[in-house]
Structures are given as structure tokens and as C-alpha cells.
Amino acid sequence: MTKHYLFEDSATGEEFIVGADCVTDANVIASEYFEEPHFVCRLTDFEAEASGLDEY
């Protein structure tokens, strides 16, 4: 089951969500799209949908 992980990119300040099975996989995906991604927290399905943030 895919979980939603909130990240912030230190280089740009952009917040974004990564959908992955675990936080380790989410970190790998985040690093493919952003220079300095930092994991913030895990979001529920509702929180991820309501946030309006881009999800990778």
C-alpha cells in the first residue's frame, strides 16, 4: 500500500509529497527530483489529498 511522505527541498523551500511503500524509497524518489530534499513527516490519504501539493 502506498503511503504519502511530506518533504521540503532546502534549496528551493518547496514542499512536496512522495508516494512510496516506505520512507527509504521515498527518499530515493525525492532525490531524483530535488537537490536537497528533507523528510518532514508521513501524511494520511486525506491530508495528502487536501494539501494540494504536488505528489511524485
Annotate each PLM feature:
Residues 31-56:
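Short, mixed-charge low-complexity intrinsically disordered segments
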Residues 14, 22-25, 29-33:
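Acidic, low-complexity, intrinsically disordered interaction modules
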Residues 1-14:
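Short aromatic-glycine-(Arg/Gly/Cys) micro-motifs in beta-strand/loop hairpins
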